[in-house]
Amino acid sequence: MHRRQFLSGLAALAFSPRSSAAEVEVDGVRLNRRLSELTSFGRTLEGGISRVAFSEADREARKLAMSWMREAGLAVRIDAAANVIGKREGRDDSLPPLLFGSHLDSVPDGGNYDGQVGSVGAIEVVQCLEERGIATLHPLEVILFTNEENGKTGSRAMAGELVGSELDLPSHTEKSITEGISFLGGDPARIDDARRKPGEVFAFLELHVEQGAVLHRRGIDVGVVEGIVGIERWNVRVDGFANHAGTTPKDERQDALLTASRIVDAVNGIATETEGRQVATVGKIVAHPGAPNVIPGRVELTLEIRDLDMVKIAKLQSAIEIETRRIAAVNGTSVSFEKYYESRGAFADDRLRNVIRESAEALGLSTLFLPSGAGHDAQSLALIAPMGMIFVPSVDGISHSPKEHTLPEDVEAGANVLLRSVLATDALALD
C-alpha cells in the first residue's frame, strides 16, 4: 500500500564532508526495537500501556531514553519542568537551537505509539547524524516533554504558558503536578527557568502518529500538518422540574433530559451542516435525580468544539446556544452555558510545511496536508517559534487504546522524513 523508495535528493544542505546528506537514512531496525523496548514500562495485562506522567513507569522509561540520548552523543539534562533535553552542538552555537521531540507518557491503558514514535524517532535522527559525522549549523536539541497527556505541562512551561496555580492540580497518579515534577528530577520552585522566549528557539519539529484514520484509509504515507485545532469546552446545564413519572400528565412535564437529548441532536446537526472540518461533541451527560420513577429536573452535559479557526468555534457555539435556548423554551425548561476550557489553535509555519512535504517526496513518499484534531506539544511551541509536524498513519485510526498501532515501515519512513526535515530546516532563513 505504501511506497518505500528511499531516493536521494536533498540539495544545498550544510553537512560534514564525511557523509552526504542524500545518503543518510535512519536505522529502522534499531528505531523499532527501541519502541518495542519501551513497552516494558507500564505494560497492562490487556496488552496496553499505562505509563502515565509522574509514575514509576514514566520515570524508568525516561531513564532508558536518556541512555539512548547519551549514546547518540547528546549532552543530557533535566530542566525545571522535568523536560528531558539532549543538546548537540552546532557549527555556530551562537545561533538559537533547532528543537524536535515529543513525549513518553501515555494515557491510562493506552498504546505505545502516541508520543513514543516522535521521541524515539528524534533520538534516532541525532544518532544517525552522529554516526555519519554530519554537522549542522544550528545546535540541535531533542526534547522529551513532561506530562503531555494531562495538560502539556512541560511544553507549556517552555512556552511560558503554565499558570502557577496549575502546579497544585492532581495528576493521573496520587501526586500533584508539583510533586510529579520533583519526582522526575525537575524543580517546580524554579519553573520559570524552563521558559524559552521568542527568538530563543530557531524552530520546532514533531513527528507523531496521526491518531486518526485519514492516512491509513487513503493509503497516504505522510501527513503534513496544516495546524493543530483549537478546543473550547462548556458545561451546559438544563433546568426543568423534577416530578412524579407516573402522575404528571404529558402536557405538564418539564423534562430536562428530553431537552438535553434534543440538544445533543441539534449539536450534531449544526456541526454537520456547517461547511468545514469542525467537530462538536457532547461527551458527558448526568441526569438528576437519576431515579427511574422521577422526571429529570436537572441535566448537566458537556459541549466541546474543535476547529483550526477560533472565530469559527465562537460562531458555531453561538449558533448552538441560540438553538438550545429555543429547544429549552419549547419544553418549558431553561439552559445555561459556562466555558471552562480553551486551548487556542496553532498553525504550522508555511515554510516548514513545504520542507516536510519536499522531504517526504524526495523519499518517494505520498503526502497529504491535513489538520491535527488532537492537541500536541507542538501547539505550545508554536507560541515561541516556527512549528512543523509530521504525521504517520495510525492503523484503522485507533489511538489512546491498547489496539493503537503504526506499521514499522511507517515509523521508519516518518523518522527519515524528520531527518531530512531537520537538515533542510537547519539551512533555512526563518527570520
Predicted feature descriptions by range:
Residues 150-151, 156-311:
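Midchain, well-structured core segments that form catalytic/ion-binding scaffolds
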Residues 25, 40-44, 174-226, 264-269, ...:
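Active-site-adjacent substrate-binding region
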Residues 31, 39-44, 101-102, 367-417, ...:
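Zn-dependent metallopeptidase/amidohydrolase metal-coordination segment
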Residues 79, 135-136, 191-195, 247, ...:
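Flexible, glycine/charged-enriched surface loops at secondary-structure junctions
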Residues 28-36, 41, 48-111:
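Acidic/His- and Gly-rich active-site-bordering loop/insert found
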